[in-house]
């Protein structure tokens, strides 16, 4: 074997190694991207858990307010003030009921979003590890 043969062989091996290293670097980059996305979705899921806790706390407060509104704690003598009180109390009950329904809808939406975020986090984590 002369020097040119050795040089040619080394250069071809170097090209193979370089190509292989580039493929590995690309794979690492892709998997790192998946891990970043998985981490972002996990963080989103975590934050949505706190939002759900806040909504549940608010729902309990609204439920307490609705229960309190159903109790007649004020007695007014005379028809006119009593009628006004009843109308305002009924309006408050109606608004609290609407607020409760909105809270329930928001709670469902947040729960679905949290589930989807968890699924996406798992999906990207699995992509990164496979």
Curated annotation (Swiss-Prot):
- Keywords annotated in UniProt: Secreted, Virulence
| Mutant phenotype after disruption | Deletion mutants display only a small defect in acute infection, but remarkably are unable to promote persistent abscesses during animal infection.
The subcellular location is: Secreted
**Keyword presence, Secreted:** yes
A GO cellular component annotated for this chain's UniProt record is: extracellular region
Tell me where it mainly resides. Answer: secreted
What does induction of this protein depend on? Answer: Negatively regulated by EsaB.
Does the record's keyword annotation contain Secreted? Answer: yes
Q: Which family does it belong to?
A: Belongs to the EsxC family.
- Assembly and interaction partners: Forms both homodimers and heterodimers with EsxA. Homodimerization is calcium-dependent.
Give the protein's function: Required for persistent infection.
- Tell me the protein's name: Type VII secretion system extracellular protein C
Which gene underlies this protein? esxC
